[in-house]
Amino acid sequence: MARKCEICGKSPATGNTVAKSKVTTRRVWKPNLQKIRVVTDEGTVRRMYVCTKCLKSGKVQKA
């Protein structure tokens, strides 16, 4: 599974975790992806990985 929203293309973001002592370690923020059944533009139904922001904003029509 690619950790990427199939609608908006949101993918994992990287950065640092900064401790109180200012020691930094790399970390990853992963998008909240849900595997749902979606009605496509052609009218067919398929399963897609969609982030919750796209679900809430109504960018996809659930089947």
UniProtKB/Swiss-Prot annotation:
GO molecular function: structural constituent of ribosome
GO CC terms in record: ribonucleoprotein complex; ribosome
Keywords assigned by UniProt, alphabetized: Ribonucleoprotein, Ribosomal protein
UniProt key word Metal-binding: no
Gene3D superfamilies hit by this protein: 2.20.150.30, Ribosomal protein L28/L24
A biological process from GO: translation
Family annotation (Pfam families): Ribosomal_L28
Top-level taxon of the source organism: Bacteria
Keyword check for Ribosomal protein: yes
Alphabetical list of InterPro entries matching this protein: Bacterial_rp_bL28 (IPR050096), Ribosomal_bL28 (IPR026569), Ribosomal_bL28/bL31-like_sf (IPR034704), Ribosomal_bL28_bact-type (IPR001383), Ribosomal_bL28_sf (IPR037147)
Family label: Belongs to the bacterial ribosomal protein bL28 family.
Protein name per the record: Large ribosomal subunit protein bL28
Gene name, Swiss-Prot/TrEMBL: rpmB
